[in-house]
């Protein structure tokens, strides 16, 4: 998409200016460069390259808030590749550093809900309910932070009677 390309180029140009203007050490600048390269590779679908860049960024980054976004993006890659356990691990790590990272809360709920659906299909109803309840807990935390988002989730919580649970 041309508009996405324009946005990426504008973001890169602004990032370069910010990194030159704001006083920061070389390690932080390098971490940000790896993070930015990881984002570009992720957008292009080159997940191996993205993970490599994110790993380098994670090793250099000292700010817990920034680390949370690196970990979150790594989780996205694993989720996109169907490795839900690794995705959950990275989402949990990101939430340990940034408990209000609403995207990680939401995506954790998505994976847990999916696991609930799988358990339901396998007629493991107690296990399904456990996963659905866990998904509801994460989604309610996300909705508390962003109450105007996730209308489908809010409807699911209401229709399943999980609005007040947890």
Curated annotation (Swiss-Prot):
Protein's membrane topology: Peripheral membrane protein
Keywords: Membrane, Photosynthesis, Repeat, Thylakoid, TPR repeat
GO BP terms: photosynthesis
This protein's GO CC annotations: plasma membrane-derived thylakoid membrane
Renumbered ranges of TPR repeats: 31-64, 68-101, 116-149
Primary site of residence: membrane
Subcellular location: Cellular thylakoid membrane
Family in the record: Belongs to the Ycf3 family.
Task performed by this protein: Essential for the assembly of the photosystem I (PSI) complex. May act as a chaperone-like factor to guide the assembly of the PSI subunits.
Record protein name field: Photosystem I assembly protein Ycf3
């Amino acid at each position: 998409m041309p508009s996405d390309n324009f946005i990426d180029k504008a973001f890169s140009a602004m990032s370069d200016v910010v990194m030159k203007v704001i006083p920061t050490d070389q390690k932080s600048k390098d971490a940000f460069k790896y993070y930015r390269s990881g984002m570009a590779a992720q957008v292009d679908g080159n997940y191996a390259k993205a993970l490599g860049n994110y790993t380098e960024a994670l090793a250099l980054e000292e700010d817990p808030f920034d680390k949370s976004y690196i970990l979150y993006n790594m989780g996205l890659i694993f989720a996109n590749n169907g490795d839900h356990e690794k995705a959950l691990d990275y989402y949990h790590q990101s939430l340990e550093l940034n408990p209000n990272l609403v995207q990680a809360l939401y995506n954790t709920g998505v994976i847990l809900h999916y696991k609930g659906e799988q358990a339901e299909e396998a007629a493991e109803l107690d296990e399904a309910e456990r996963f659905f309840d866990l998904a509801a807990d994460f989604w309610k935390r996300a909705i508390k932070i962003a109450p105007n988002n996730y209308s489908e989730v809010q409807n699911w919580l209401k229709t399943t009677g999980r609005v007040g649970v947890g």
